[in-house]
Amino acid sequence: MAESDLEFMRAALDEARTAAERGEVPIGAVLVHEGIIISRAHNCTLTDNDPTAHAEMVAIREAAQTIGNHRLNGTSLYVTVEPCAMCAGAMIQARVARLVYGCAEQKGGAVRTCFQILDHPAVNYRVEVISGVLAQECAAVMQDFFAQRR
């Protein structure tokens, strides 16, 4: 793990905290190309009334618009929580090169925990995966958010 991985995960954590402040499930994401953040996002499913507006999806959409290409070759996606099946599929379609995530998602993590979509033999594209980056901080943001709602 490089120092830049920590830096970019901290940026994703900032996005997660923004989501929490807005009453959204606190997941944040940043998409990086050649060491530069090209998009940043947080969950906004409630705000936008859009079940697909997960942090990863929003970051991927914004990055594609920014660079003018649906293929995000050579990019790294930093996410505070392990992506779901929808988001893992979007990474494959967008050709994200690398996924770095914080904490595991026990109720639907589709990269390592519940499913391994990115490793499925039928998938014709491979995403490098690094997990556990700032995992405790990422998990704490989620735990604090849900503790306040119970």
Language-model segments: what does each one mean?
Residues 69-82:
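Immediate flanking context of iron-sulfur cluster ligation sites
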Residues 1-19, 83-150:
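Zinc-dependent deaminase
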Residues 38-45:
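Short beta->alpha transition motifs characteristic of CBS
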Residues 12, 16-19, 29, 39, ...:
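Small-residue (primarily alanine) positions within well-ordered alpha-helices
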Residues 33-34, 61, 73:
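A cytosolic small-molecule/anion-sensing beta-strand core signal
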Residues 2, 45-46:
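A short, polar/acidic, helix/strand-boundary loop motif
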Residues 27-35:
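Short beta-strand scaffold segments in enzyme catalytic cores
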Residues 47-58:
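A short, polar/charged loop-to-alpha-helix boundary motif
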